């Protein structure tokens, strides 16, 4: 028997003993009728107290004679005879409580407080003061147990097993990990910042169906579900695009939506099957207008959320205050694979040879545009570290984008890259109903040839275009990847509160 097995068994026995002891304490509280009170009202948060009073001296605090009311989770406790120090954690941070036997009602300190456990939720009232070491603290005159925790606080996380725990039991991660709490605060600030920016630009926030009869707006494999009342199969949406453009047809000329998309694909550090996107559509604009808007959005968000246009991500530094780089797809390929020339990329046989030399398995159904795109992804994408717009995507891989006036092989489209990963995708929208119908037909052919990610034919959307879509540009930005960048997170699971996980057997 390994040394680990007795140790694991001993730990399990200790945990069971602690759980039993905590349940017995809860039973005693139930007997007294005070198990889960709900009459304590908090008036102050720890971060607000530190911000307002943290720089004041103890003499100044005594003169102010400030009584505060706080509540939160007991994270640490140091019992020193007749007095104790407690660290209380709330949504704003942590603050220290000073608990003296003589300042509480008789019996509370020895008969109640000492029997409480780490992780319990407490309410406290008292005067602010500074300890001899200068720490802002609350001298408690009232201390109450608000919620009895039946399980102990988690240890600090480390190692693979604990990473799994962080994702599966995010509530434990948020209790124990300051960095995780900050990540999701930043995420909330990013979402709020995007909404403020969009509203200031005259956009209206809308909501479109999450379940669709025809999944559209992107090339991806959808999740399938069944609507019992209608007795039809439906799809969780892979993108809101086609519904948002229907709204532009209807006269809402600037719309945006922040919501989840679902794609039945692999899980990786950059991909989660359920993810958050912001999509916007702007009438009487083209893709160049959205390139400028994207720059302005990122510059505004970094400065308002992070307080600086400079973002540190691992060992990389991005300055969003500087103009972003711009390259065509072919320019990017030639830059990062110098032996390649544009003439070879425009020749099907030579392009296929380049792709195969890179280990790309070229499918028979692929045209030249798809081959070029695969070469780009293999040779250039990972090198696009600084904020970069890639333009001139082939029409073959851009079934919803408007063809370029001078070169119908390409579209007026861009993708936005930071740190070697795609963050956004935008283009001048295809508003030619007949061209759109043909491209849908081409997608159906690709699907019949075995391309699971090819689009469906959406006849109603073509009908909408026949009523007239104004010249329009659209943009989609991955919120999760944006938050990864802003929080220096290197896996998408760290920025999604409850990421998709394989069930524990």
Curated annotation (Swiss-Prot):
Cofactor: Mg(2+)
GO cellular component: cytosol
Positions bound to Mg(2+) 2: 422
Keywords attached to this entry: Aminoacyl-tRNA synthetase, ATP-binding, Cytoplasm, Ligase, Magnesium, Metal-binding, Nucleotide-binding, Protein biosynthesis
Cofactor note: Binds 3 Mg(2+) ions per subunit.
Top EC class, one word: ligase
Listed EC numbers: 6.1.1.6
InterPro entries the record matches: Aa-tRNA-synt_II (IPR004364), aa-tRNA-synth_II (IPR006195), aa-tRNA-synth_II/BPL/LPL (IPR045864), Lys-tRNA-ligase_II (IPR002313), Lys-tRNA-ligase_II_bac/euk (IPR034762), Lys-tRNA-ligase_II_N (IPR044136), Lys-tRNA-synth_II_C (IPR018149), NA-bd_OB-fold (IPR012340)
Record-linked CDD domains: LysRS_core, LysRS_N
HAMAP family: Lys_tRNA_synth_class2
Similarity comment: Belongs to the class-II aminoacyl-tRNA synthetase family.
Name of the protein: Lysine--tRNA ligase
Native species: Yersinia enterocolitica serotype O:8 / biotype 1B (strain NCTC 13174 / 8081)
Gene for this chain: lysS
């Amino acid at each position: 028997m390994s040394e680990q097995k007795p140790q694991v068994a001993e730990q399990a026995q200790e945990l069971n003993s602690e759980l039993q002891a905590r349940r017995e304490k809860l039973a005693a509280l139930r007997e007294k009728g005070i198990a889960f009170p709900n009459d304590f009202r908090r008036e102050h948060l720890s971060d607000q107290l530190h911000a307002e009073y943290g720089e004041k001296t103890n003499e100044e605090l005594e003169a102010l004679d400030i009584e505060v009311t706080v509540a939160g989770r007991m994270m640490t406790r140091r019992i020193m005879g007749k007095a104790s120090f407690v660290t209380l954690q709330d949504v704003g941070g942590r603050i220290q409580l000073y608990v003296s036997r003589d300042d509480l009602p008789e019996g509370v300190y020895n008969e109640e407080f000492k029997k409480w456990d780490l992780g319990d939720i407490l309410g406290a009232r008292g005067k602010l003061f500074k300890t001899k070491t200068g720490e802002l603290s609350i001298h408690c005159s009232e201390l109450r147990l608000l919620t009895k925790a039946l399980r102990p606080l988690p240890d600090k996380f480390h190692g693979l097993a604990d990473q799994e725990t962080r994702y599966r039991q995010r509530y434990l991660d948020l209790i124990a990990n300051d960095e995780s709490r900050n990540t999701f605060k930043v995420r909330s600030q990013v979402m709020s910042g995007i909404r403020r920016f969009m509203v200031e630009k005259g956009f209206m926030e809308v909501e479109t169906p999450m379940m669709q009869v025809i999944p559209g707006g992107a090339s991806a494999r959808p999740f399938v579900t069944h609507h019992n009342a209608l007795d039809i199969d439906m799809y969780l949406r892979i993108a809101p695009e086609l519904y948002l453009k229907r709204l532009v047809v209807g006269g809402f000329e600037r719309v945006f939506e922040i919501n989840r998309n679902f794609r039945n694909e692999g899980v990786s550090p950059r991909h989660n099957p359920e993810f958050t996107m912001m999509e916007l559509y702007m009438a009487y604009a083209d893709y160049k207008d959205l390139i400028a808007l994207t720059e302005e959005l990122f510059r505004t968000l970094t400065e308002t959320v992070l307080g600086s246009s400079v973002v540190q991500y691992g060992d990389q530094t991005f300055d969003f205050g500087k103009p972003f780089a711009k390259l065509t797809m072919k320019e990017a390929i030639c830059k990062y694979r110098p032996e390649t020339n544009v003439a070879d990329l425009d020749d099907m046989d030579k392009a296929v040879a380049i792709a195969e030399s890179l280990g790309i398995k070229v499918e028979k159904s692929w045209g030249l545009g798809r081959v070029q795109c695969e070469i780009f992804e293999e040779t250039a994408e990972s090198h696009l570290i600084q904020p970069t717009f890639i333009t001139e995507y082939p029409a073959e891989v851009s079934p919803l984008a408007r063809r370029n006036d001078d070169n119908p092989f390409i579209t007026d489209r861009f993708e936005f890259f930071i740190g070697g990963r795609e963050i956004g995708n935008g283009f001048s929208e295809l508003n030619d109903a007949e061209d759109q119908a043909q491209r849908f037909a081409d997608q159906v052919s690709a699907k019949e040839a075995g391309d699971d990610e090819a689009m469906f034919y959406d006849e109603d959307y073509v009908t909408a275009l026949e009523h007239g879509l104004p010249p329009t540009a659209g943009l989609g930005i991955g919120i999760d990847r944006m938050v990864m960048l802003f929080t220096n997170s290197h896996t998408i699971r760290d920025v999604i509160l409850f990421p998709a996980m394989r069930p524990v057997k």
